[in-house]
Amino acid sequence: MNPRRKKRLLVIVAVLFGIGASIGLVLYALQENINLFYTPSELVDGKGPNKEKPQIGQKLRIGGMVVPGSVERNEQSLKVSFTLVDTGPTVVVRYQGILPDLFREGQGIVAQGVLVEPNVIEAFEVLAKHDEEYMPAEVAEALKGIKHEKPKYNLDSGN
């Protein structure tokens, strides 16, 4: 092989190696930010035709309705746990922080967090509906057939 071909081959190999390394680094960086959406049924039973379940420690988002009577608050801290349901199994969500003002039992929410047990999510963000009619598209699709409960307000002041 003459020196000119050898130099050209070396440049081509270096460029291909650089492109491969760049693609690998981009995919690695994106892997850290991927969090898939699940419903409680998909989380417990598996998602898709292969019934794939998320791994313990995986970041994910879960959407469902807060089961009435399931919200438990710790009096000494901001820790809260509640149960989510769609049309089947329930999932427990644990959260430490101030819940959104619109968070209520019987309402749809989306929680973002980490799977710590097969049916327990340690959430770092909880999103509630914006108004009576709004529901994220993912949650609306997942919760077809569930009766939505409007919050009950006592407007009679008794005076």
Swiss-Prot record:
Compartments where found: Cell inner membrane
Keyword RNA-binding among UniProt keywords: no
Membrane-spanning ranges: 9-29
Residues binding heme: 130, 134
Keywords recorded for this protein, A-Z: Cell inner membrane, Cell membrane, Cytochrome c-type biogenesis, Heme, Iron, Membrane, Metal-binding, Signal-anchor, Transmembrane, Transmembrane helix
Membrane topology classification: Single-pass type II membrane protein
Ranges facing Periplasmic side: 30-159
Record SUPFAM superfamilies: Heme chaperone CcmE
Gene3D superfamilies: Nucleic acid-binding proteins
Cellular compartments per GO CC: plasma membrane
Alphabetical list of InterPro entries matching this protein: CcmE, CcmE-like_sf, NA-bd_OB-fold
Record topology, Cytoplasmic segments: 1-8
Domain of life assignment: Bacteria
Gene Ontology MF annotations: heme binding; metal ion binding
GO BP terms: cytochrome complex assembly
NCBIfam families for the chain: PRK13165.1 (NF009638), PRK13254.1-1 (NF009727), PRK13254.1-3 (NF009729), PRK13254.1-5 (NF009731)
Job of this protein: Heme chaperone required for the biogenesis of c-type cytochromes. Transiently binds heme delivered by CcmC and transfers the heme to apo-cytochromes in a process facilitated by CcmF and CcmH.
Family in the record: Belongs to the CcmE/CycJ family.
Name of this chain's protein: Cytochrome c-type biogenesis protein CcmE
Organism: Pseudoalteromonas translucida (strain TAC 125)
